[in-house]
């Protein structure tokens, strides 16, 4: 047979026929002859299509350089190196000034092809959208969380582990992640505050929640110390920030500053006055079902005396607010530990709050001391946002599981070194946290 050695021939005389096609499957040969694309060709075509879609997607990133301690400045610097035109990276703390002077990078974009990323806390999202609305409708926004609570980011699926360095500082992966995201909406609410005996009104806007009482007191104490230049070093780590919140909440645990808050506040929902439990020390109006760093306040709440059939499921785009009550600083701590539940009180589209005395109030983590008077809350508009697709969330979960399942401790010496390194880091963090707690306690309770 032509191309095959004769029986008994030396091994060196073995030849391979030039017509052998074993490396080219017959099924693929048939596809090629028929003009149909192979699996490999379809995959290449799909990648080409995705690359074309990514190329047509413009990205503008707003970074709060003051968020996350030193992290904000680092993110701003690295993103400016990673992203090339037509993509843009702007400092969110200087956005208003850039708009005032007509900077085209801050004032021009194609709403059909542009997607935005805000790197910062929930408050940064509000500041950026308020500034952009002075020019035109903002593009859909995703969030890279750098703040303390990051509740809006959690609701939209942008958890801390989504924006690792490999995704955030890689232009192709960042653009692809934003392009693949689903466009949705989040309600924005208008708060009109009037002091007793005065006609002027102060207007604020929020997207997440409004708190009155014990939670706002802790936020106000935290914000006061954070703005003091002497203690700026305390806020360089997320773990320290959370501990400081707990320290400030401890004051109200000891003093019960808002005992019988139900007598100091009258709340009317859709023109109907609602009642609160007698031990209420905090009232929270929720637009999203996440509070204080991920506590699911509405879906996990006790039904109270109203029963299961009265209330509907919480949604961020349904034009309604959910009102819950908490019973003190200890209750807030238990909520964060997921060992207690708030109490469902009401659900509605318009809320009027009468404050009979000066009380701390906070919206989206921005606190202030509100004088006695009235607060009127009503629907304002909808903010276009980007949600992490469920399929991508599932892929992230599977990736984490596979990484955990395939990880090992390495060799014995390497494992010992790793354990020692982790111990040293843990010891340093523990020392820093203790020092921060002591400084905060001494400052606030002195």
Label for each model-derived stretch:
Residues 262-276, 285, 293-417, 423, ...:
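ATP/nucleoside-binding phosphotransfer catalytic cores, i.e., glycine-rich phosphate-binding loops
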Residues 1-24:
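N-terminal chloroplast transit peptides
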Residues 15, 424-446:
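Terminal signal-anchor or tail-anchor transmembrane helices
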Residues 57-64, 352-354:
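Short hydrophobic beta-strand segments
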Residues 27-59, 411-413, 444:
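N-terminal organelle-targeting presequences
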